[in-house]
């Protein structure tokens, strides 16, 4: 019985590892394809309870202050980290251990991985997968592609995905023509896109817009130049 049990366990591990290897290889192939091809949809779009509006736009066609506004608001270390901000994660885990719940500590790369391939919610399993996918995106795509995809798939309202759809919905024009203030107002929607509007900002959100514009000035117009060229 012991020999049979060991044989069964060995066979189980063999099948499991083969399955995981196939999954990893398929994922790498998918990421390689999406490095060059706009994602036709995302897991978040597929799970949306609202009609989806999304229009792809190349990051090269956007004004430089639009990606800067998002980076200033969401992840100022984006050009410097490799997909994961360990300082923010450590702080979030300490808060979790203190009973404050699992708070967001996601980089733009992690948010891209989540929006593209995972599901809503905050738990350690999903956060772990999110972190692993983020490292994969950094290795396969690079910063420019990650930021381009994020700007095109991030949710900005109920069923509104990407800066182009958001700009058309809220400002009746292409994202190519957004002003600095309009870009900052879109950026403040990202943490809670379904409950915020750039036209109905609370005092707190007005403060966040002003803070975002100040951060953009401090970072400088050339802050993302090295990753966008």
UniProtKB/Swiss-Prot annotation:
It comes from the Bacteria. It catalyses: [GlcNAc-(1->4)-Mur2Ac(oyl-L-Ala-gamma-D-Glu-L-Lys-D-Ala-D-Ala)](n)-di-trans,octa-cis-undecaprenyl diphosphate + beta-D-GlcNAc-(1->4)-Mur2Ac(oyl-L-Ala-gamma-D-Glu-L-Lys-D-Ala-D-Ala)-di-trans,octa-cis-undecaprenyl diphosphate = [GlcNAc-(1->4)-Mur2Ac(oyl-L-Ala-gamma-D-Glu-L-Lys-D-Ala-D-Ala)](n+1)-di-trans,octa-cis-undecaprenyl diphosphate + di-trans,octa-cis-undecaprenyl diphosphate + H(+). One of its GO terms (cellular component) is plasma membrane. Signal peptide: none annotated. InterPro entries: Glyco_trans_51, Lysozyme-like_dom_sf, PBP_transglycosylase, Pep_trsgly. GO terms for molecular function: pentosyltransferase activity; peptidoglycan glycosyltransferase activity. Keywords: Cell inner membrane, Cell membrane, Cell shape, Cell wall biogenesis/degradation, Glycosyltransferase, Membrane, Peptidoglycan synthesis, Transferase, Transmembrane, Transmembrane helix. Belongs to the glycosyltransferase 51 family. This is Biosynthetic peptidoglycan transglycosylase. It comes from Shewanella denitrificans (strain OS217 / ATCC BAA-1090 / DSM 15013).
């Amino acid at each position: 019985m012991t020999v049979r049990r060991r044989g069964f366990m060995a066979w189980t591990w063999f099948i499991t590892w083969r399955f995981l290897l196939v999954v990893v290889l398929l994922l790498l192939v998918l990421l390689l394809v999406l490095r060059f091809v706009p994602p036709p949809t995302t897991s978040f779009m597929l799970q949306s309870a609202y009609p989806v509006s999304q229009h792809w736009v190349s990051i090269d066609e956007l004004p430089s202050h639009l990606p800067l506004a998002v980076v200033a608001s969401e992840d100022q270390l984006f050009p410097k980290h490799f997909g994961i901000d360990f300082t923010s994660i450590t702080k979030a885990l300490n808060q979790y251990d203190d009973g404050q719940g699992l708070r967001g500590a996601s980089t733009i790369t992690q948010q891209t991985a989540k929006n593209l391939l995972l599901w809503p919610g905050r738990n350690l399993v999903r956060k772990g997968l999110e972190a692993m996918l983020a490292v994969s995106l950094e290795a396969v795509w690079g910063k420019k592609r990650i930021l381009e995809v994020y700007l095109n798939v991030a949710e900005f309202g109920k069923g509104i995905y990407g800066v182009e759809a958001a700009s058309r919905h809220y400002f009746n024009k292409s994202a190519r023509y957004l002003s600095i203030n309009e870009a900052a107002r879109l950026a403040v929607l990202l943490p809670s896109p379904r409950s915020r509007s750039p036209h109905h900002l609370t005092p707190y959100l007005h403060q966040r817009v002003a803070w975002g514009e100040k951060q953009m000035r401090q970072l400088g117009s050339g802050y993302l130049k090295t990753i966008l060229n």
